[in-house]
Amino acid sequence: MLCEDQHMSVENTPQKGSGSLNSSASSISIDVKPTMQSWAQEVRAEFGHSDEASSSLNSSAASCGSLAKKETADGNLESKDGEGREMAFEFLDGVNEVKFERLVKEEKLKTPYKRRHSFTPPSNENSRSNSPNSSNSSANGDAAAPKGGNNPHSRNSKKSGNFRAHKEEKRVRHNSYTSSTSSSSSYTEADPAILSRRQKQIDYGKNTAAYERYVEMVPKDERTRDHPRTPNKYGKYSRRAFDGLVKIWRKSLHIYDPPTQARDTAKDSNSDSDSD
């Protein structure tokens, strides 16, 4: 009846790609679609690429990988071989010396003195006294040089002599203790404005009670270097230097300042107390 009409029939022979599922109540047949080979093959099939192209790409990638491996292996071998290498440097100083001498002989290069190495002994030809910049000529150097070779004492004496000569060449500044007049007119001050200013400074220092007491206590014949001396206004000084001399002179005159009234009263009080 109704149950028999609704009964589903199941074929005995299963179709290709289909499966059957049996249960106690009823039997249901399920069809299964054929599976594709892979997702990549589907993409190639859509774009029209064949399996030959994919195989060629795979083979080219494999060949590139093998080449990279070979290159790394070769680099490792070269680095191992390079560890055993030795490098040698050769400095050609002699070539420069030969070139320098050739240029000097051809008069293409002129030097004030000849080059001499530190390990070669000094000689008359290689000595620096032959240079035009040296103070002593080669003849004077040969005459002054001792027979026994280089003497350090002679070198020191030469240096001291040159230093003294250089000091003598400098301008000599005459202070108030040397002499009132200089030996040369070039070292005397002749500007009337400067002389009048210096005279005012000297007069200002002399117009003090300390200078008057100094003249009374110490005559000119008994004065020594320790006593204050009036600065020489004719000396060749700068303005700052002469002002410094005047300052020192007036400071030394303060020793002869007269005692103040307070000191006198203190002395009187002390004398009265002693007498009592």
From Swiss-Prot:
Modified sites of kind Phosphotyrosine:
177
Q: Which Pfam families match?
A: SLBP_RNA_bind (PF15247)
Gene3D superfamilies named in the record: Histone RNA hairpin-binding protein RNA-binding domain
| UniProt keyword annotation of Secreted present | no
Locate the compositionally biased regions of type Low complexity. Answer: 18-29, 53-67, 121-146, 176-188
Q: Which UniProt keywords apply?
A: Developmental protein, mRNA processing, Phosphoprotein, RNA-binding
Gene Ontology MF term list: histone pre-mRNA stem-loop binding; mRNA binding; RNA stem-loop binding; sequence-specific mRNA binding
Q: Where is this region: Disordered?
A: 1-35, 50-83, 104-236, 254-276
Basic and acidic residues bias locations: 68-83, 213-229
What is the tissue specificity? In late embryos, expression is restricted to proliferating (CNS and PNS) and endoreplicating (midgut) cell populations.
Family statement: Belongs to the SLBP family.
What does this protein do, in the record's words? Involved in histone pre-mRNA 3' processing and couples histone mRNA production with the cell cycle. Both maternal and zygotic proteins play an essential and vital function for development.
| Quaternary structure and partners | Interacts with Sym and Cpsf73.
This protein is called Histone RNA hairpin-binding protein
Q: Which gene encodes it?
A: Slbp
